[in-house]
Each structure stands twice: as structure tokens, then as C-alpha cells.
């Protein structure tokens, strides 16, 4: 089942911001979406607001 996690890209490597349940060397597919762009696109009403905070709240409420 697909799982969405946040990651940061540093020095050519994607680093997850939370623990992932993977074995060392396991291959995965990554779909890149900038968090801010997703929130602004779907929730245009939030333009100019703290989109990262809004997305985290939506995830907590089970909408994402």
C-alpha cells in the first residue's frame, strides 16, 4: 500500500523526516511533489498563509 512521507533533499540524497519501515537496500518509487505547491493548488484559499502548518493539520485530521 502506498505511504506518503515527507523527506528533505540534501547533498543529492532524499532523507526521510520520519522513520520508514524498509529493509536496507530495498528499492522504492518516489513521486516528487513540493508540499507548498500541493497545498496552494488544492487549497487556494490558503495563499499567503503557512502552508506547511496547514498541510500538517490536514494530515492530522486524516484529509491527506
Curated annotation (Swiss-Prot):
Pfam families: AF2212-like. Keywords: Toxin-antitoxin system. The keyword Transmembrane does not apply. It comes from the Archaea. Coiled coil: none annotated. InterPro entries: AF2212-like (IPR008203), AF2212-like_dom_sf (IPR024069). Possibly the antitoxin component of a type II toxin-antitoxin (TA) system. Belongs to the UPF0165 family. This is Putative antitoxin AF_1074. It comes from Archaeoglobus fulgidus (strain ATCC 49558 / DSM 4304 / JCM 9628 / NBRC 100126 / VC-16).
Amino acid at each position: 500500500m502506498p505511504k506518503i512521507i515527507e523527506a528533505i533533499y540534501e547533498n543529492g540524497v532524499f532523507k526521510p523526516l520520519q522513520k520508514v519501515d524498509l529493509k536496507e537496500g530495498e528499492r522504492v518509487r518516489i513521486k516528487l511533489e513540493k508540499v507548498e505547491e500541493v497545498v496552494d493548488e488544492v487549497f487556494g484559499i490558503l495563499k499567503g498563509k503557512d502552508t506547511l502548518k496547514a498541510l500538517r493539520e490536514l494530515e492530522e485530521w486524516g484529509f491527506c
